[in-house]
Amino acid sequence: SKVQYGIYSQGESRSNKNQGTVIQLNNIDLTSTANTAVAGVYLGFENNAQISGNTIKNISNSTKTVAGIALGLLPSLNMNVFNGNDVANSVISLNTIRDIARIGDGSAFGITMAAVIAGGSSTNELSNNMLFNINSTAATTMDYIAGILVGGGAVGTTKVLYNTIKLAG
């Protein structure tokens, strides 16, 4: 199959975010012989979202950067800008994310989170997730591989707690 996202949810704007989205207990397997997947779950402009108990696996692409869960930040080859469609006051927990691969040179991430840049105080929590086999098959010094990538920002707090990360298989 040729699908880019297992689950995609996008609010209208920073001032009109989706409220209370729940993504729970899904099995997202984007196995594709064409290597066309980008992310298992993508959320943008969300408030009070919960992503928990999901199994996300076999995300691969030969032309784009890939992620298991992307929160307001669609990964790019050059990860030096962390602003995006921010997700606020949300909990991402108890997910298993595995076999995320950029085929060839490029970047791959287990979980990405954009910086929260406006809207007052916000607390996001990434906890008790298990991430493994996150890789690029021909990474160069310009490529970026990370289990969890969190963009910094002046507004809000991000708690990264009790996750298990093993980049290799």
Question: Can you name each region flagged by the protein language model?
Answer:
Residues K2-S15, T33-F45, S62-G84, I103-I117, ...:
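Extracellular beta-strand/beta-solenoid scaffold signature
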Residues S1, N16-S32, N47-N61, A70, ...:
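Right-handed parallel beta-helix
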